[in-house]
């Protein structure tokens, strides 16, 4: 990955699109336990899984907690700039010179930016109040900071 830009909320990178196929061990039960597979089924290339439009895809490393617990500081957001935005998508937005990621919702002539963390307010803007640019749509979130104890 090559760093291309930093803001107060994100570091942006271009994806490294080298192929790396890893063994896919089949499915794992997250409900009731199931018998384990006795063999590996196939392989998986993470870039092919996460990047649908290579020329329009960027990674951003999150800072801040407005999307916690889904997105934590250090989470990697996969952002596709080729996708059209619509309400109820997680978007990377550029507002008054800063990037932020929030769920977006159009309400009349206003745009609402909705955090997941209840400690943060929903932001609502009309075209007169702020210049908002939907920079891209978050298509995947990579959390490499999984805690080994249960979430509380």
Residue ranges and their predicted role:
Residues 1-67, 140-152:
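Short, positionally conserved secondary-structure boundary motifs
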Residues 57, 86-90:
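Short, hydrophobic/aromatic-rich segments at coil-to-beta transitions
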Residues 65-68, 89-101, 105-111:
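Short, compositionally biased
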Residues 74-76, 89:
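Structural motif
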Residues 106-152:
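Glycine- and charge-enriched low-complexity intrinsically disordered segments
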């Amino acid at each position: 990955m090559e760093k291309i830009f930093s803001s107060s909320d994100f570091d942006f990178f271009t994806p490294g699109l080298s192929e790396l196929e890893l063994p896919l061990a089949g499915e794992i039960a997250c409900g009731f336990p199931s018998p384990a597979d006795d063999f590996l089924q196939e392989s998986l290339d993470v870039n092919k899984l996460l990047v649908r439009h290579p020329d329009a895809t960027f990674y951003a490393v999150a800072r801040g907690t407005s999307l916690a617990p889904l997105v934590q500081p250090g989470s990697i957001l996969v952002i596709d700039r080729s996708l059209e935005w619509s309400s109820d998508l997680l978007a990377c937005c550029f507002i008054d010179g800063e990037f932020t990621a929030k769920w977006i919702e159009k309400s009349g002539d206003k745009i609402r930016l909705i955090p997941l963390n209840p400690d943060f307010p929903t932001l609502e803007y009309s075209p007169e109040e702020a210049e908002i640019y939907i920079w891209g749509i978050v298509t995947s979130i990579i959390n490499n900071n999984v805690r080994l104890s249960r979430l509380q």
